[in-house]
UniProtKB/Swiss-Prot annotation:
Site-annotated residues for Important for tRNA non-discrimination: 30
Catalytic activity, reaction form: tRNA(Asx) + L-aspartate + ATP = L-aspartyl-tRNA(Asx) + AMP + diphosphate
Gene: aspS
Name this polypeptide is given: Aspartate--tRNA(Asp/Asn) ligase
NCBIfam families: aspS_bact (TIGR00459), PRK00476.1 (NF001750)
Gene source species: Crocosphaera subtropica (strain ATCC 51142 / BH68)
């Protein structure tokens, strides 16, 4: 039986006999003495096999190669001074192997060397295909351990300190398409009927509040059939929570306690409380996004009122058409950013146009506050407008002013993107800094131009601000998102718990009462049986762990992730199924593979 994990052996174990299991990370032969780095999920310890001191283990030690699986029994010894290795936790000790048992070898050539630093350069496709080897690597093993530690901290805080109950909700449920596409599962028992995999446990957790389970949580698997990005997967994990009889203020306070507990448990970092807050309106005005990275100070300035009557039609026309003109003032930007970068073909021009802008207007502030820009701007701004621009933006000599003009959404998207890119390039962002921020008072609805209707910004079960009930179309939501260094890690709201208000919200997004009862009748009926006021939040576990681990993709903190084509390279899922299975389900595929042209 194992007595220790590799990384847990220290100088306090000297002279003890230990039993270890693991993989051969490296094997070295130094003048007849064989050294083996033994690895398990915790780390590495050095094993020594000496033909004089440990003759019984030596013949097997000679045969070992990378990734062989072994059991080792040996005595812990102090390393000689010249062999000390301060780079690893076990660098003070080594184990003289009295017995080595080969449990399994490697029968094929390794696709990459697990222990080599070059494994970091291996293509991700190869790593995902041989994920069981990839997960042996130190970086990946640490990511999984961190994920476990985060979940453990969540459970301890919610259960031990806040009296939450962990309750599982169904994976097979009904399709209620609102937002992303559902993954559908045909029912063999009920031909022609379909289950859907849940996009979230939203409705069931609200029903649990009706049931009297007033503090619920779940580490929930969720499924969304949507286009993938670096921080999206078709199946993902949430910490899902719901609470009855709590105000928005109380929910935010409880969740700040949770997040602080996680950071202390896994990073030994004390976060200051309370977390700063910004309304959605203020966030969009200052940063152009509801997920601002507040680790650096560049902010947007609205100058629409100053330039609305200017002779420069790009500015005045934008305001006339109901849009905005905003500025990103960049201290020291004159020395860092060239005209080539801003003009067509430049990298910053491309960043802006990728976000929907037609281009970037600019003004450089020179000595004595002289303005350097293209003639069309310089000649069509009055001296008063120029003075007002400098005063409003606080610009001084050396500043570069980047302008966005057009519809408000495009201006915000393009300038917020430029703000982040420039902040990174000018090294304004401290990678060690942790800024957590609540965004509150979201709009209830946004306009869907394609479908020509309002749709819920979060979801249609979000409670409107009570002061806005008379005009739901423009109402603010009692909703809140938690943003960590510019990434949304959690979002929630108070919920509607009165049937009449829920019916009005459905009507506002274009659902008739008949449609609403067909899709959500079970929820509306439950509201007639004494539903308590309640609210909740869900955290993206994958995204949170990614940020804590310093990774750039959630695929590196998930044991067996999908690719950006929603496929598993290890198991080759998704895959076709035989016609017998389809026949049992009374399902027929109409897909016809495209014939490749010669």
């Amino acid at each position: 039986m194992r007595t220790h994990y590799c990384n847990h052996i220290s100088a306090t174990d000297i002279d003890k006999t230990v039993t270890l299991f693991g993989w051969v990370d490296r094997r070295r032969d130094h003048g007849g003495v064989i050294f083996i780095d033994l690895r398990d999920r915790t780390g590495i310890v050095q094993i020594v096999s000496d033909p004089q001191r440990t003759p019984t283990s030596y013949p097997i030690a000679e045969t070992l190669r990378n990734e062989y699986v072994v059991k080792i029994i040996g005595q812990v010894s102090q390393r000689p001074p010249e062999s000390l290795n301060p780079k690893i936790p076990t660098g003070e000790v080594e184990i003289y192997a009295e017995s080595i048992e080969l449990l399994n070898g490697v029968n094929k050539q390794l696709p990459f060397v697990v222990s080599s630093l070059e494994a970091e350069l291996v293509k991700e496709e190869t790593r995902l295909k041989y994920r069981y080897l990839d997960l042996r690597r130190d970086r990946m093993a640490k990511n999984l351990q961190l994920r476990h530690a985060v979940v453990k901290a969540m459970r301890r805080y919610l259960e031990d300190e806040q009296q939450f109950m962990e309750i599982e909700t169904p994976i097979l449920t009904r399709s209620t398409p609102e937002g992303a596409r559902d993954y559908l599962v045909p029912s063999r028992v009920n031909p022609g009927q379909w289950y859907a995999l849940p996009q979230s446990p939203q409705l069931f957790k609200q029903l649990l509040m009706v049931s009297g389970c007033d503090r619920y949580y779940q580490i929930a698997r969720c499924f969304r059939d949507e286009d993938l990005r670096a921080d999206r997967q078709p199946e993902f994990t949430q910490l899902d929570m719901e609470m009855s009889f709590m105000s928005e203020e109380e929910i935010l306070d409880l969740n700040e306690g949770l997040v602080c507990h996680i950071f202390k448990a896994v990073k030994n970092i004390e976060l200051p409380r309370p977390f700063p807050r910004l309304t959605y309106q203020d966030a969009m005005a200052k940063y152009g996004t509801d997920r601002p990275d507040t680790r650096f100070d560049l902010t947007l300035v609205d100058v629409s009122d100053i330039v609305k009557d200017s002779g420069f039609k790009v500015f005045s026309g934008a305001v006339k058409n109901g849009g905005k003109v905003k500025v990103l003032p960049i201290p020291g930007g004159n020395d860092i950013i060239s005209n080539v970068q801003i003009k067509p073909g430049g990298d910053l021009f491309k960043e802006a146009t990728d976000a929907g802008a037609k281009g970037i207007a600019y003004i450089r502030v020179k000595e004595n506050n002289k303005l350097d820009t293209i003639g069309a701007i310089k000649d069509n701004l009055t001296e008063e407008q120029k003075r007002e621009l400098l005063a409003r933006t606080g610009a001084k000599p050396g500043y570069l002013l980047l302008f966005g003009a057009g519809d408000t959404d495009t201006v915000n998207k393009s300038l917020s993107r430029l703000r982040l890119v420039i902040g990174q390039r000018m090294n304004l962002i401290d990678p060690e800094k942790i800024n957590l921020l609540w965004i509150t008072e979201f709009p209830m609805f946004e306009w869907n131009a394609d479908e020509k209707r309002l749709e819920a910004l979060h979801h249609p079960f979000t409670a409107p601000n009570l002061a806005d009930l008379n005009d739901l179309a423009t109402a603010r939501a009692q909703a809140y998102d938690l943003v960590y260094n510019g990434v949304e890690i959690g979002g929630g709201s108070l919920r509607i718990y009165q049937k009449e208000i829920q019916e009005k919200v459905f009507e506002t997004i274009g659902l008739s009462l008949e449609e609403a009862y067909n899709k959500f009748g079970f929820l509306l009926e439950a509201f007639e049986y004494g539903t308590p006021p309640h609210g909740g939040i869900a955290y993206g576990l994958d995204r949170l762990v990614m940020l804590l681990a310093g990774e750039e993709s959630i695929r590196d903190v998930i044991a067996f992730p999908k690719t950006q084509q929603a496929s598993c390279l290890l198991t080759e899922a998704p895959a076709s199924v035989d016609t017998k299975q389809l026949k049992e389900l009374q399902v027929k595929s109409t897909y016809k593979p495209k014939v490749k042209e010669e």
